[in-house]
Regions:
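OB-fold (S1/OB) nucleic-acid-binding surfaces
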Residues: 50-78
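Short boundary/loop segments of OB/S1/cold-shock single-stranded nucleic-acid-binding domains
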Residues: 13-32
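Netrin-like (NTR/C345C) domain of secreted extracellular proteins
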Residues: 1-7, 84-200
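Conserved positions in beta-strands of structured domains
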Residues: 40-42
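Solvent-exposed loop/turn segments at secondary-structure junctions
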Residues: 44-48, 63-66, 79-82, 103-107, ...
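Short, solvent-exposed beta-strand/turn "edge" segments of beta-rich domains on protein surfaces
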Residues: 26-35, 46-50
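Short, surface-exposed secondary-structure edge patches
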Residues: 26, 33, 83-89
Length: 200
């Protein structure tokens, strides 16, 4: 095992406020994505400062849709020059549920649809139960009927992000204050929902 390669900084020197043509519900994102998977972020590969994106190694832990390679390049919006508020650059060990599109047609690089709007962070309860956290609230705002969904208050949120890296935990916490809590989805319920969507 080698020392993980980390991004030079988790935050850019500037903040970018992105405007999106649309927001996605879980079901819309699932249908539109080339691939949907729970992934673990590995080494930082580098950044493209012209397009303000950063590249990371990522490994698929669980695939729900599409034919992702076991290891692929995850492309995140943001770089050392600019990041979106509340959305630090990933780091080695970050676990995510992502709704992905092929970035450049190579089948090796993928980016989340509309970037952070379709990125859910993986968090765990005390018993080791796995949940997916919508820290920006944009997916859950479109999706009031998805099973297994709960809204956490700040104390519950602090508990469930205690093992998350401190930069991300702090970003999630400040985001939750802006949105009056964060929604989480239970893994088992979302997996059942995905298998129903896949049959449609």
């Amino acid at each position: 095992a080698h020392e993980p390669v980390l991004p030079p900084s988790r935050w850019g020197e500037m903040q970018i406020n992105s405007m999106f043509e649309r927001y996605y519900s879980v079901s819309d994102a699932f249908q539109e994505a080339d691939a949907v998977a729970r992934v673990k972020v590995g080494d930082w590969q580098g950044e493209d400062l012209r397009n303000w994106v950063t590249f990371f190694d990522a490994s698929v832990q669980e695939s729900y849709k599409g034919e992702l390679p076991r290891s692929f390049t995850l492309v995140q919006g943001g770089c050392s020059e600019a990041t979106s508020p509340g959305y630090p650059l990933f780091t080695s060990g970050t676990e995510l549920l992502v709704f992905l599109r092929d970035y450049d047609g190579s089948g090796e690089k993928y980016h989340p649809i509309t970037d952070y709007n379709t990125v859910l962070y993986v968090v765990y309860d005390e018993a080791g139960g796995r949940y997916f956290l919508d820290s920006f609230g944009t997916m859950s705002a479109q999706d009031t009927c998805v099973p297994g969904r709960t809204t956490l208050d700040s104390a519950q949120l602090a508990e469930m992000t205690a093992d998350t890296d401190p930069v991300l935990a702090e970003a999630i916490s400040s985001q939750a204050k802006d949105c009056d809590g964060c929604s989480i989805y239970a893994e088992s319920a979302l997996e059942d929902y995905f298998s129903d969507l896949a049959k449609q």
